[in-house]
UniProtKB/Swiss-Prot annotation:
GO terms for cellular component: large ribosomal subunit. The gene is rplB. One of the primary rRNA binding proteins. Required for association of the 30S and 50S subunits to form the 70S ribosome, for tRNA binding and peptide bond formation. It has been suggested to have peptidyltransferase activity; this is somewhat controversial. Makes several contacts with the 16S rRNA in the 70S ribosome. Residues 224-274 are annotated as: Disordered. This is Large ribosomal subunit protein uL2. It comes from Francisella tularensis subsp. holarctica (strain LVS).
Length: 274
């Protein structure tokens, strides 16, 4: 059961908090055999320089090893529990295969404890089942989509997201993404049936800066508040508007300027996003 709770304004830090509580989530520790140490990099590379801004601090986390390939074919897996994962917006499910192996998978919406999932070439069209796109009927809602066969899911993995299979053309399937983009994907690529879980994730409000810091997210300082040495918008006597069109700290236009490079996979885009 999902509970959306707005905190009472007992303090400035509680006034804007909106929390989403799922009573079906496992409250204990993760399965020990499927976690590994996640070392905090604080946005630095191997030379110690900041390569990703606004990262650092936060609570220690363990990385949950999630199975994105779903390559254990024709063996039924029973859902043992649904868990919170600090490394992604979606929930994850711990599944136990009939041969005794356990794996984490991204939990789709509607998947509950004691339900079963299976992957393979020709399996039932049911929530949580994984199969090649060639065997999925048109109009089906899918997630966890591979971009290359056997590489593992790379698209549609965030909370509440989904794509729709709208066509099949020779060796390719045509899928419609949430952005409105229509894209061709090889029919041998796999996908999972259903919508990704935790669709209420966007309703959550952290309410205070400290909650961001717990997650390892540091403040974003405006360029106009910096010195000229630090940002193209910096400097000036008194408050200024920057004096030029908005740019990044490296002088590249921002606020709507498209920076996506042309890739070889561009030819697979049938219709650009809206």
């Amino acid at each position: 059961m999902i509970e959306i709770k707005k905190a009472k304004p007992t303090s400035p830090g509680r006034r804007h908090v909106v929390s989403v509580k799922n009573t079906e989530l496992h409250t204990g520790k993760p399965f020990k055999g499927l976690v590994e140490v996640k070392k905090s990099k604080a946005g630095r590379n191997n030379t110690g320089r900041i390569t990703v801004r606004h990262q650092g601090g936060g609570h220690k986390q363990h990385y949950r090893i999630v199975d994105f390939k779903r390559n254990k074919d024709d063996i039924t897996a029973k859902v043992e529990r649904i868990e919170y994962d600090p490394n992604r917006s979606a929930n994850i499910a711990l599944v136990l295969y009939a041969d005794g192996e356990r794996r984490y998978i991204v939990a789709p919406k509607g998947l509950k404890k004691d339900m079963s999932v299976i992957s393979g070439e020709k399996v039932d069209i049911a929530v949580g089942n994984c199969m090649p796109l060639r065997n999925i009927p048109l109009g089906t809602v899918i997630h966890n989509i591979e971009m290359k066969p056997k590489k593992g899911a790379q698209m549609i993995r965030s909370a509440g997201t989904f794509a729709q299979l709208v066509g099949k053309d020779n060796a390719y399937a045509i899928i419609r993404l949430r952005s409105g983009e229509m894209r061709r994907v090889l029919l041998d690529c796999r996908a999972v049936i259903g919508v990704v879980s935790n669709s209420e994730h966007n309703l959550k409000s952290l309410g205070k800066a400290g909650a961001k810091r717990w997650r390892g997210i540091r403040p974003t300082v405006r360029g106009v508040a910096m010195n000229p040495v630090d940002h193209p918008h910096g400097g000036g006597e008194g408050r200024t508007s920057g004096g030029r069109h908005p740019v990044t700290p490296w002088g590249i236009p921002t606020k709507g300027y498209k920076t996506r490079r042309n890739k070889r996979s561009n030819k697979l885009i049938v219709q650009k996003r809206k």
